[in-house]
Amino acid sequence: MRWYAVDDLSAEETARLAQALRDMEFSSGMTGLYWLPVPEAMLSPVQREHAADCGPYALGLELEEHSLRLELLVRARGRLRCDCVRYAGPELRAHMIAYLDQLLTDLQIAG
């Protein structure tokens, strides 16, 4: 599995991030797991084609007491296995990492 990880976070920082993710309605229903939505404009042609049946698409963000991991696999929330489930390409990967880094900056989380 490919990940983008940030560690050495304080428990207070991860609690603040968890609250922000809940406020944005990114909760998954599982403790410590959040879904970061993939912008529609950045979906692959196959993902656009499958969006009605397999979407929405998201990257999983796993939040632990002192770290976070952004999974770089684009998951189809409507289906577990499909050709549209694939690793983020370079542009999407860079966008999602920058998005997460900006969120951490906005929350004054150094990481």
PLM features per residue range, with description:
Residues 1-4, 35-51, 93-102:
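Charged, low-complexity, helix/coiled-coil-prone segments
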Residues 4, 21, 79-83:
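Small/flexible residues
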Residues 12-15, 43-44, 77-81:
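Short, surface-exposed beta-strand/loop "edge" segments at domain boundaries and coil↔beta transitions
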Residues 16, 20-58:
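Ser/Thr-rich, low-complexity intrinsically disordered terminal regions
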Residues 7-9, 37, 73:
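A structural detector for beta-sheet-dominated domains
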Residues 1-19:
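Terminal, regulation- and interaction-focused segments at domain boundaries
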Residues 51-111:
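C-terminal basic regulatory modules in eukaryotic proteins
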Residues 3, 31-33, 67-69:
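A generic structural signal for beta-strand entry/edge sites
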